Amino acid sequence: MLSAQQFLKEFNNVESLDESLYEIVSQICEEVKLQGDKALKNYNLQFDQVETEKLELEQSQLKNAYDMLDNETRDALEQSYQRIKVYQENIKVKQESSQQTECYERYHPIERVGIYVPGGKASYPSTVLMTATLAQVAGVNEITVVTPPQNSGICQEVLAACYITGVHHVYQVGGAQSIAALTYGTETIKKVDKIVGPGNQYVAYAKKFVFGQVGIDQIAGPTEIALIIDESADLDAIAYDVFAQAEHDEMACTYVISENEKVLNQLNTIIQEKLQYVERQDIISQSIANHHYLILAQDTEEACLIMNTIAPEHASIQTRAPEMYIDKVKYVGALFLGHFSPEVIGDYVAGPSHVLPTNQTARFTNGLSVNDFMTRHSVIHLSQKTFNEVAESAEHIAHIESLFNHEKSIHVRR
């Protein structure tokens, strides 16, 4: 257990990418740029041990995957989709009327978007729902999913989620090579305008490498959660909230903050007991051993200071009055209030996207939303009257900046 002062002194959660990957990723990207589909098939064989004749799956395969779902799985995916869709429709930015002002903004959906869906050890239909639904609501014209190939075939639930969300193209390719393909295009894969979705360090570094040639959502690090709890919290539930993050990755970070030392000690005992038989024990044990923190705060203000310093991907408040933290906890990817709003609900069915900022980037950026799949530009349409009211000031500023043709462009209209 750490005091708030000890924690704040030691805390530095800004993970840097492994610089040794730069050369590997740059070589992969260059190879895909030059060799196209051939490079993708070679990398599928090299990295995933899968020989791929066709990179693109047929739309009929997506529909078949959906049709073959059992009722419980279909209902779960559909409910998740509907909740995400309704939430995103509610927060979608509304077009301003050109009748109300001479200066306003217009929004347009991005033309083509690529979504990375992780594969390998686990499959994530929820990632499809939490990204492609947003693109669909935004009105993106062409939604492309890339996901690593499997010898047994792509996870059927992932394909079904692609069908539900109206994905236009699904390609069997993963890793840095898929990011390169989406950026540069190949014989089969069209280049996109923006790439979103989580992945491993190779994917993260590839997104960083191609940024500027294509838009990206973020460069994601390991998952993280910070919880503020008091004596009213259900400590068994809190332990599983901690395990739920820790089971993702040995590097996953979990923080529990309380003003009550006894509560933290009790929680620690429960966590250690449950660790003996918890599923995915190997991953969870490593995460708990290296990236789990119990932090004792002196008061609510100090607890919030710690939370805002961590700026976690997920923040959970499980106290008697969680609502009192709404305005005090500012820098988090998503804020979960109360016993019945565990972070895991946000992973699957709450409505907001689970693609959230990590590594303290919540201090300056936001979780993925429908509006990230749209562009905006300002429109300026002045009347002669308004022009005459502002022209002299504009002309004068141009003059003091010695931009004389700017000045003349205004002057000739007066």
UniProtKB/Swiss-Prot annotation:
State the EC number(s): 1.1.1.23
GO CC annotation terms, alphabetical: cytosol
Question: Which parts of the sequence bind NAD(+)?
Answer: 116, 177, 200
Q: Which PROSITE patterns match?
A: HISOL_DEHYDROGENASE
Q: Name one GO biological process term.
A: L-histidine biosynthetic process
Cofactor dependency: Zn(2+)
Alphabetic keyword roster: Amino-acid biosynthesis, Histidine biosynthesis, Metal-binding, NAD, Oxidoreductase, Zinc
What does the cofactor section's free text say about binding? Binds 1 zinc ion per subunit.
Question: Could you tell me which species this protein originates from?
Answer: Staphylococcus epidermidis (strain ATCC 35984 / DSM 28319 / BCRC 17069 / CCUG 31568 / BM 3577 / RP62A)
Which PANTHER family is this protein grouped with? Answer: HISTIDINE BIOSYNTHESIS TRIFUNCTIONAL PROTEIN, HISTIDINOL DEHYDROGENASE HDH
Q: What does this protein do?
A: Catalyzes the sequential NAD-dependent oxidations of L-histidinol to L-histidinaldehyde and then to L-histidine.
| InterPro entries, per database record | Ald_DH/histidinol_DH, Histidinol_DH_CS, Histidinol_DH_monofunct, Hstdl_DH
Task: Give the protein family.
Answer: Belongs to the histidinol dehydrogenase family.
Q: What Pfam families does this protein's entry cite? A: Histidinol_dh
Q: What pathway is it annotated to?
A: Amino-acid biosynthesis; L-histidine biosynthesis; L-histidine from 5-phospho-alpha-D-ribose 1-diphosphate: step 9/9
Q: Which SUPFAM superfamilies match?
A: ALDH-like
Q: What class of enzyme is it?
A: oxidoreductase
Q: Which GO terms describe its molecular function?
A: histidinol dehydrogenase activity; NAD binding; zinc ion binding
The reaction(s) catalysed by this protein are:
L-histidinol + 2 NAD(+) + H2O = L-histidine + 2 NADH + 3 H(+)
Q: Write down what this protein is called.
A: Histidinol dehydrogenase
Q: Per UniProt, what is the name of the gene that codes for the protein in this document? A: hisD
Provide the residue positions that the database annotates as binding Zn(2+). 245, 248, 347, 406
